[in-house]
Amino acid sequence: MAIERTLSIIKPDAVAKNVIGQILARFEGAGLKIAAARLAQLSRAEAEQFYAVHKARPFFNDLVNFMISGPVMIQVLEGEGAILKNRDLMGATDPKKAEKGTIRADFADSIDANAVHGSDAPETAAVEIAFFFPGMAVYSR
C-alpha cells in the first residue's frame, strides 16, 4: 500500500471537550504520522470556501455555523493507506451508527457535531491539504 497524506480536522465540539490529545493519540497509535498541525478559528469565508462542495445541500449553513463556532485542530496525517485508515478510525458520519471504539462513537454527539472531518479520496486530500497548508508547511517524517 502506498504512503498517502490526508487532511483531518478535529471539529469545535471535540476541541471544546478537550479530547484533542486522545484523538491525535489514536491516529499515531494506528501508525499515522502528523506531518503538519495547527489550531485555528475558521472565518465564515474560510468555512464556506472549504465546504463549497456542499453549498446546495440543506445542511450547508448549519455546517458552516458549526465549523466557526469555536477553534478547530487541523492536521495532515501521513502513512500507508492514510485516507482509508483515518476514515476507519473516524467511524460512520452519524455517531449512532459508528462502530464502538471509533472516534465518532466515543466523542461525537450527533450527525452535525460529529467530532472529526477526514478527506475521502486522494484528490480531495490534495485539495484540502493545500487549502489549509499552502506552500512548505507540510513535512515528511
UniProtKB/Swiss-Prot annotation:
Signal peptide: none annotated. It is found in: Cytoplasm. PROSITE patterns: NDPK (PS00469), NDPK_LIKE (PS51374). Its main location: cytoplasm. It comes from the Bacteria. Coiled coil: none annotated. GO terms for cellular component: cytoplasm. Pfam families: NDK (PF00334). Its cofactor is Mg(2+). Its EC number is 2.7.4.6. HAMAP family: NDP_kinase (MF_00451). Belongs to the NDK family. Homotetramer. Major role in the synthesis of nucleoside triphosphates other than ATP. The ATP gamma phosphate is transferred to the NDP beta phosphate via a ping-pong mechanism, using a phosphorylated active-site intermediate. This is Nucleoside diphosphate kinase. It comes from Leptothrix cholodnii (strain ATCC 51168 / LMG 8142 / SP-6).
